[in-house]
């Protein structure tokens, strides 16, 4: 099992992740990408995972350049068309624990390699109070920013399913952005409607592409819903 926090330079890994995911044989490896959307533990520097117009230490918001220029890197979807014979790919959000646990169980049971991208709040880098972490995480999916979906590759053919978060709710999206200090320059001293609309537009473009992929490569039952009785889970043994 590999833990990956930064994915803008996958070639920095000692064993290349893309090489493992491309292997045809049985390969029981799970990569978990905890996506905090920047190089957080080294100083909140911008990365490929940073969303548009977010302020970081290497791309601070100013009068001329309002934060990051460019879109957030899509990590999960391209792997579905990587040519691998068997893969399990998914996005998760801890604000939806049943979905997260169900996907992690499926990933660990997969005969092939698995890659799970987790929405990972960082109160220091995102500039918000600690007690708002779960609220913000839930808003991320509810507003359409962080959709929850799965790609199961069998014999090289991807099959898409989703749980929620593909439809944009503009009011919730604005609330989501406003809840974090990394976007405060979009609201103060003036309301930067053009930049906010661009973030929503880029996100909607991505979600529309996902909808088309689900339509073209979707399962017979495209909605993925996990029912987990957490009371029946065995207690963890810590040694």
Model feature map: region roles:
Residues 1-46, 95-102, 107:
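Thiamine diphosphate
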Residues 15-19, 46-51, 130-135:
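Short secondary-structure boundary/capping segments
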Residues 27, 85, 142-146:
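Structural alpha-beta junctions
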Residues 27-32, 37, 77, 86-90, ...:
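Structural motif
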Residues 48-110:
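Conserved thiamine diphosphate
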Residues 93-130, 134-136:
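ATP/pyrophosphate-binding catalytic subdomain of soluble kinases
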Residues 120-239:
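Flexible, low-complexity linker and terminal segments
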């Amino acid at each position: 099992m590999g833990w990956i926090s930064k994915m803008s330079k996958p070639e920095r890994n000692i064993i290349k992740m893309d090489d493992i995911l491309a292997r045809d044989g049985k390969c029981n490896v799970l990569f978990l990408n905890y996506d905090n959307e920047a190089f957080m533990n080294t100083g909140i520097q911008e990365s490929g995972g940073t969303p548009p117009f977010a302020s970081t230490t290497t791309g601070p918001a100013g009068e001329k350049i309002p934060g990051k220029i460019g879109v957030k890197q899509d990590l999960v979807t391209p792997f579905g068309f990587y040519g691998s014979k068997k893969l399990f790919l998914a996005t998760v959000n801890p604000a939806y624990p049943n979905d997260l646990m169900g996907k992690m169980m499926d990933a660990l049971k997969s005969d092939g390699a698995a890659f799970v991208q987790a929405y990972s709040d960082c109160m220091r880098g995102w500039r918000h109070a600690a007690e708002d972490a779960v609220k913000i995480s839930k808003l991320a999916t509810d507003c359409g920013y962080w959709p929850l979906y799965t790609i199961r590759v069998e014999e090289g053919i991807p099959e898409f399913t989703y749980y929620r978060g593909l439809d944009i709710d503009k009011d919730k999206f604005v609330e989501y952005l406003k809840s974090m200090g990394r976007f405060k320059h979009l609201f103060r001293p003036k309301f930067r409607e053009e930049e906010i609309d661009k973030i929503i537009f880029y996100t909607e473009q991505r979600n529309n592409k996902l909808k088309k992929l689900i339509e073209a490569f979707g399962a017979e039952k495209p909605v993925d819903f996990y029912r987990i009785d957490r009371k029946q889970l065995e207690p963890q043994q810590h040694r």
